Amino acid sequence: MANGQISPQRAVTKPQSWWLTSEPRPSLMLQLPKPSPSAKPCASVEEAYEICRQVTAQYAKTFYLGTLLMPPAKRRAIWAIYLWCRRTDELVDGPQAATTTPETLDHWERRLEGIFAGQPQDDADVALVDTLETFPLDIQPFRDMIAGQRMDLYRSRYQTFEELDLYCYRVAGTVGLMSSAVLGVDTGNGQAPWQPDAVYIPQEEAIALGVANQLTNILRDVGEDVERGRIYLPLEDLERFNYSEQDLLNGVNDDRWRSLMKFEIDRARHYFEDAERGIRALNRDARWPVWTALMLYKGILDVIEANNYNVFNRRAYVPTPKKLLYLPVAWLRAQVL
């Protein structure tokens, strides 16, 4: 997706939106009850949102910090979306992933359709159903995310960046589209240049932020993914820098690896730059949290560099004091950019 453009492969699934860590999962996220017309969720709407908040706070600390800067209704909606995305990811990347089949994902997609029809099947669904009644979310990004999980069922390698870009759109760019429907746009700020009376909707930039976050995840988690038999770095990039799969398996950190990582980090930063251009189109109450989330995630790339590109046995994370320093900077950017 050069210069913010959607690749032809994913344009066919683009609707009219990274944050998933590899830490231990709570048991709630592993439950996938069978459909039952008579089943009634026991949680109230408030209880359901509290479940979403707790999971987000425990397993996506950096992301959660950004949501606390949002108005209450928006932050709760984002927590509900996060939990659905997390549970979807769990199907192919969690402790019970070995039991997941294409039929499992078919069932999960039918369950999604039920949620959009206002029919929750468990406590966690209750919050998302309520969110759908409040915000104009499209089902297509959710479907596309499930399609991304289908890719993980069959693939552990990506030959080209175009292939990886499609995967990143499906599992993370979609999150940008889901979130932007909640965050909203500033109807008095900026128009599409080819349609002066129209409100500019930063869909491309929303996708770019999701892809940037996913590329950052991939670079941060290289060592963990290799241990699980997965290589997300495009094989054409490894070949370009004369770095083999065996080198990757052995955790070789030499000049070839550092050059490869510099190349990949530059690519991720390009997506972050694309995303930044869309923030000014968001509602004013969304700009500070989005700037904060972007800066926090982009900061992981700086830490990877500071660690001399050692992602094999050192996990890159932004320390809490630095996270707090980002807050006033993000606030200032939200006011003037």
From Swiss-Prot:
Involved in the biosynthesis of carotenoids. Catalyzes the condensation of two molecules of geranylgeranyl diphosphate (GGPP) to give prephytoene diphosphate (PPPP) and the subsequent rearrangement of the cyclopropylcarbinyl intermediate to yield 15-cis-phytoene. It comes from the Bacteria. Pfam families: SQS_PSY. One of its GO terms (biological process) is carotenoid biosynthetic process. This is 15-cis-phytoene synthase. The gene is crtB. GO terms for molecular function: 15-cis-phytoene synthase activity; geranylgeranyl diphosphate synthase activity; metal ion binding; squalene synthase [NAD(P)H] activity. ATP is required for the transferase activity but it does not seem to be hydrolyzed during the reaction. InterPro entries: Isoprenoid_synthase_dom_sf, PhytoSynCyanob, Squ/phyt_synthse, Squalene/phytoene_synthase_CS, Trans_IPPS_bact-type, Trans_IPPS_HH. Belongs to the phytoene/squalene synthase family. CDD domains: Trans_IPPS_HH (cd00683). Its cofactor is ATP; Mn(2+); Mg(2+).
